[in-house]
Amino acid sequence: MVIIETLPLLRQQIRRWRQDGKRIALVPTMGNLHEGHMQLIDEARARADIVVVSIFVNPMQFERPEDLASYPRTLQEDSEKLTRRGVELVFAPAPADVYPQGLEQQTYVDVPGISTMLEGASRPGHYRGVATIVSKLFNLVQPDLACFGEKDYQQLALIRKMVADMGYDINIVGVPTVRAKDGLALSSRNGYLTAEERKIAPQLSKIMNALAEQLSNGERHVDELLEQTAEHLRNAGFTPDELFIRDADSLQPLGVESQRAVVLMAAWLGKARLIDNQQVDLTL
C-alpha cells in the first residue's frame, strides 16, 4: 500500500492505473476508521481492481473551529488497518494542498434543495462542504465507482444528485449501516461516549425501529409520531436534535403517492451526536 499526500503524485499514480485498464473504486473518509468503514472497503474491493481510500478531515464542512480541532486524527492506526485490508492507495493530503488559496477563495459546489433541507437547515454550509470535497476527490481520483454508507442518508442522497446533475460517470454505491451486536450504528462519534452512555446508546435504534414499525402498520399522523418519539428519547436519556419522517426517494414530506418512507434521527448523548435512519416500505 502506498500513502500519497500531494495532488501531482496522486494524478501520476491514477494515470498509470488508467493506462493499464484498471477499474478504480474510491472510499472517501475523514479517518478514525472503524468496522463500518471496512465494510465500505470490502464492497469497493468486490467491485474494482484498485481501492483508493481518502483520509481528509475537511475543514469546509465544520461549523465550529473547536469541532474541527478536536476531531480525531489517527493516520498511523488507520494506515495499519487499511494495509491489512489490502487497500492499494491512501490519499491523505493536508488542507493547504486541497485548498491552496484558503476556504474564502475556494470554488464551491452547492447542491440546491438537499443541502439546505432537514439537517442542512440547522447546519448551514455543511453539505456544501461535503459536496465540494467529494467533487474534488472525484476529479482527482477519477473513480469508476465510489462507496458511501447509508447511515448518513441525506449525504448519500446529496452525492447521488450531484453526480446526476454534474454528469459524472461514476457509480455511487450505498452500503448498509453496520451495527454493533446491540444495534448501535457504528460511528467515529461513539468514541465520545462514556461507559454509562454506551449502555444507553442502543436505545436510539430501538426507539427508531418502534417508530418505523408504526409507519409500517399504517400510522400516518406524522406530527404525533414525532412528538411521541422525542418524548421516548428524552425518557431514555437523549436530547433530541433532528427527527424527520420523509419520502425515502425525494426527502420531501410524505404524500399519498409515497411508497417508501425514511425515518431520520439525530440525538445528543453526552458529548456525542448520534445519527441513524430506517427505511420503511409503505406498500405492504
UniProtKB/Swiss-Prot annotation:
Classification via SUPFAM superfamilies: Nucleotidylyl transferase (SSF52374)
One annotated Gene Ontology cellular component of this protein: cytosol
Calcium keyword on record: no
Gene3D superfamilies in alphabetical order: HUPs, Pantoate-beta-alanine ligase, C-terminal domain
Catalytic activity of the protein: (R)-pantoate + beta-alanine + ATP = (R)-pantothenate + AMP + diphosphate + H(+)
Catalytic site: H37 (proton donor)
PANTHER family: CYTIDYLATE KINASE/PANTOATE-BETA-ALANINE LIGASE, PANTOATE--BETA-ALANINE LIGASE
Quaternary state and interactors: Homodimer.
HAMAP family the UniProt entry points to: PanC (MF_00158)
Family listed: Belongs to the pantothenate synthetase family.
NCBIfam families registered for this protein in UniProt: cyt_tran_rel (TIGR00125), panC (TIGR00018)
Other comment: The reaction proceeds by a bi uni uni bi ping pong mechanism.
Protein name: Pantothenate synthetase
Primary gene name: panC
